[in-house]
Regions:
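Bacterial N-terminal signal peptides
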Residues: 8-16
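Bacterial N-terminal signal peptides that target proteins for export
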Residues: 1-8
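N-terminal leader/targeting pre-sequences
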Residues: 18-69, 74-192
Length: 192
């Protein structure tokens, strides 16, 4: 068979599969864990690069947070009541680690393997009580698969009280380096 015909036939099979994943969208309505004045919305949109890599753009808008930088992470369970129900950072796969192991039992679950969790995002900078960011990651997907946010128990977005220092203090893990206490949480829901 001619190489051009092979290419066209392969494209007819591959491109619809890529296009099917492109355009998926999700949303999360965030509420303060202990302060009802804290509210926000996260919009997530999946797109596929020309190389076929799935990326998710996260747009976050928050109100009512104290000024300064706040860690933002995608957590492994789609539950926010209480905020601790969201579990650890989203980190599926054979090398994933969202829970403490016996050698590190003095560290919080979210600090283990940090900043290499799939759900680790950038810090949110809040000024005059308002913070926004737009961040694209290829560490998670909305479509089904190993990195999907929509596994059996879903996922949530959590905003923390402190900035994420990415636990990179001279290659040593320090308690709280992943952002400290949970300030706000929202369950991620697929909308398209």
């Amino acid at each position: 068979m001619h190489p051009t015909i092979k290419f066209i036939l392969a494209s007819l099979i591959i491109l619809p599969a890529i296009a099917a994943a492109d355009g998926l969208a999700a949303v999360a309505d965030l509420k303060g864990c202990t302060n009802a004045a804290i509210t926000g919305t996260a919009k997530l949109k999946e797109q596929v690069t020309p190389e076929g890599v799935k990326e998710v753009t996260v747009e976050l808008k928050m109100k009512g947070l104290p000024d300064g930088k706040h860690a933002v992470h995608i957590h492994e369970v789609g539950a926010c009541e209480p905020c601790s129900a969201a579990g650890g950072h989203h980190d599926p796969g054979p090398a994933g680690q969202s829970r403490p192991d016996s050698a590190m039992d003095t560290m919080p679950a979210t600090d283990i393997n940090h900043p290499f969790h799939m759900g680790d995002l950038i810090n949110l900078d809040v000024k005059n009580g308002v913070g926004t960011f737009k961040h694209t990651t290829n560490r998670v997907t909305l479509a089904p698969g190993r990195l999907s946010l929509f596994d059996a128990d879903g996922s949530a977005i959590v905003v923390h009280t402190q900035p994420d220092t990415y636990c990179d203090e001279e290659s040593e893990l320090k308690k709280g380096c992943a952002g400290g206490t949970r300030e706000a949480c929202g369950v991620i829901r697929l909308v398209k």
